[in-house]
UniProtKB/Swiss-Prot annotation:
The lineage of its organism: Eukaryota, Fungi, Dikarya, Ascomycota, Saccharomycotina. It comes from Candida dubliniensis (strain CD36 / ATCC MYA-646 / CBS 7987 / NCPF 3949 / NRRL Y-17841) (Yeast). GO terms for molecular function: protein folding chaperone. Its main location: mitochondrion. It comes from the Eukaryota. One of its GO terms (biological process) is mitochondrial respiratory chain complex III assembly. This is Mitochondrial zinc maintenance protein 1, mitochondrial. Interacts with RIP1.
């Protein structure tokens, strides 16, 4: 039970970090969390409970690392509100994948085959 409570608190904390400047979305996210806890309150076996707790921890981690709120500025551009826990990638994996894939504008890459091949 304590791991469940800890996961729930972590998820609430994650919603506060991810949606700190957007009260309607924060409230909706917290309602979803509460509903999910209620829906899973009837789980009986330890593996089911552990799976639900792990899923809740994964959701909290995803919210903290991947959700960034943005505000539209007067000039039409968006200001993104990054925080210290936001995961910032370097796009290296995207660049590596393009070498293998080739162009999708008609030229066939190494890993792309047509139906005629």
């Amino acid at each position: 039970m304590s791991s469940t409570l800890s996961a729930y608190r972590n998820a609430l904390r994650a919603t506060r970090i991810a949606f700190r400047q957007d009260l309607p979305i924060l409230q909706a996210a917290r309602m979803q969390l509460k509903q999910g806890i209620r829906d899973n309150s009837n789980l009986q076996t330890q593996p089911e409970i552990e799976e639900a707790v792990q899923k809740l921890n994964d959701v909290a981690k995803f919210l903290i690392q991947n959700i960034v709120q943005g505000e539209k500025q007067q000039d039409g551009k968006y200001f993104l509100n990054f925080h210290e826990k936001t995961e910032l990638g370097d796009n290296e994996t995207i660049k590596q994948g393009r070498k293998e894939m080739g162009s999708l504008a008609g030229k066939k890459g190494n890993s792309i085959k047509s139906c005629k091949d």
